[in-house]
Amino acid sequence: MYDLTALRQQTDEIIDNLLKDGSDPEALHIIEHHIAHHDFDKLEKLVVDAYKLGYEISEAEEIEDDQGNVLFVCDIVSEVKLNGDIITAQQQELLPLIEKAAAEYEGWGTYFEDPNAEEDEYGDDGEFFDDEDEADFNNAKVH
């Protein structure tokens, strides 16, 4: 069980620091909720459920933890205003899925959005994921 009060405090601190550093408060930010699991199939089921809720999913990677155990990690991604209420609502929606899958929620992150940038770093359409990535996910075999 995750402590939503502590998560909200962390969220508020992250947002405050980004805004103090000058990140654009009006920009949409890519929010990446970091997930880890020792079982790829269970992680895959979790991210399919998150995808059905409207989130994008980054490609899973295999890593080793400090003890040499294999973990599979990925991000559940959205693009929203940098707003604590929105991010907390996402956590409240995702944490039951994460707990059900016995996965680990490792917090969330985002990128600095320069208010003076002339061009979107994600290209002309401003999309974090391109249509090919989405098509690849939709065509992936689900176990």
From Swiss-Prot:
Comp. bias regions, Acidic residues: 115-136
Keyword field: Cytoplasm
Function (record text): Globally modulates RNA abundance by binding to RNase E (Rne) and regulating its endonucleolytic activity. Can modulate Rne action in a substrate-dependent manner by altering the composition of the degradosome.
The protein's name in its UniProt record: Regulator of ribonuclease activity B
Membrane spanning stretches: none
Family matches, as NCBIfam families: PRK11191.1 (NF008393)
Molecular function via GO: endoribonuclease inhibitor activity; enzyme binding
Family from the record: Belongs to the RraB family.
Gene name in the database record: rraB
Gene Ontology CC terms, in alphabetical order: cytoplasm
Quaternary data: Interacts with the C-terminal region of Rne.
Region Disordered, residue ranges: 113-143
Location within or outside the cell: Cytoplasm
InterPro entries: RraB, RraB-like_sf, RraB_dom
UniProt entry tagged with the keyword Transmembrane: no
